[in-house]
Amino acid sequence: KRKFLDAALRYYSISQIEKKAYLPDKSTVLDRAMIEHNNLLSASK
């Protein structure tokens, strides 16, 4: 489970960086990433 979490977080940070390249609304991307991050954390409990 821990490895999955690390991989997922790495994927989200990479996709976030990619999205920032062509998405002007950075706050929306950040909010989405935080929601996904929180979902992962609660799912791992």
Swiss-Prot record:
GO cellular component: COP9 signalosome; cytoplasm
Domain of life (superkingdom): Eukaryota
Keyword Nucleus: yes
Keywords associated with the record: Cytoplasm, Developmental protein, Nucleus, Phytochrome signaling pathway, Signalosome
Gene Ontology terms describing biological process: red, far-red light phototransduction
Subcellular location field: Cytoplasm; Nucleus
Protein task: Component of the COP9 signalosome complex (CSN), a complex involved in various cellular and developmental processes such as photomorphogenesis and auxin and jasmonate responses. The CSN complex is an essential regulator of the ubiquitin (Ubl) conjugation pathway by mediating the deneddylation of the cullin subunits of SCF-type E3 ligase complexes, leading to decrease the Ubl ligase activity of SCF. It is involved in repression of photomorphogenesis in darkness by regulating the activity of COP1-containing Ubl ligase complexes.
Family affiliation: Belongs to the CSN4 family.
Assembly behavior: Component of the CSN complex, probably composed of CSN1, CSN2, CSN3, CSN4, CSN5 (CSN5A or CSN5B), CSN6 (CSN6A or CSN6B), CSN7 and CSN8.
Protein name as it appears in the record: COP9 signalosome complex subunit 4
Protein species of origin: Brassica oleracea
Organismal lineage: Eukaryota, Viridiplantae, Streptophyta, Embryophyta, Tracheophyta
